[in-house]
Amino acid sequence: MLAVVAALMAFPSAIVAGLLIGRYPHSRIGKAINTLGVVAMTLPEFVIATILWLVFSIWIPIFPGVTVVPSNATVLELLPHIWMPALTLAAVVFAHSMRTMKAGVTTIQTMPFVESARLRGTKERVTLLRHILPAAMPPVVNTIAVDAAWLLTGTFVTEAVFNYRGLGRLAIDAISDRDTAIILPIILFGLGVYLTMSLIADMVVRLLDPRLKQQRS
């Protein structure tokens, strides 16, 4: 559930932000978001988690800083405790996807087919959504696939900071106890997740990339 919430928070907003920043790089909002993205990429995960914990649990006590619900808690009981770790993970993957999208838009918008659409009098919004966005998406899809796999398998630092009982904490406890009956399935699950995400990304890229569409036709 933590990975799903973080993905829903990060990926749609990263695509929109990267699209707008790439198209309007000199706007104040664009510069501010881009700066935040750079900071999020350079800071270690535990530092982001600590900053969010200080801000939203100590200075502005909106969310609980530590997960203290039982293992059989319902979704409604877990929701107040999931926002902080989800926001931490979302900040990390948002930065990756946003900057990949920005780089793609910056490159694509100067290409001849985009200039041709503008010369035909196509509205800028239509050009952005119909021509620039699909062409800029393939690298973003690959980035999202890697980040989504990481969200499912590599969140033990955030889970440790917020005492969230997830797959990462389970793996750490199993390694500490040398419990191979748990370690091996977790390793196989991680490998399966990365392979599955890679295959899904490859299929989505083939559907989105205009050059591959032309080759198939």
Regions found by a protein language model. Give the residues of each.
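Alpha-helical transmembrane segments of integral membrane proteins
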Residues: M1-I29, E45, A73-S217
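Membrane-water interface segments at the C-terminal ends of transmembrane alpha-helices
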Residues: T35-V66, T88-A95, R99
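Peri-membrane helix termini and adjoining interfacial loops of integral membrane proteins
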Residues: P12, V55-V68, E159-R165
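Short capping/connector residues at structural and topological boundaries
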Residues: I51, T67-V68, L119, S217
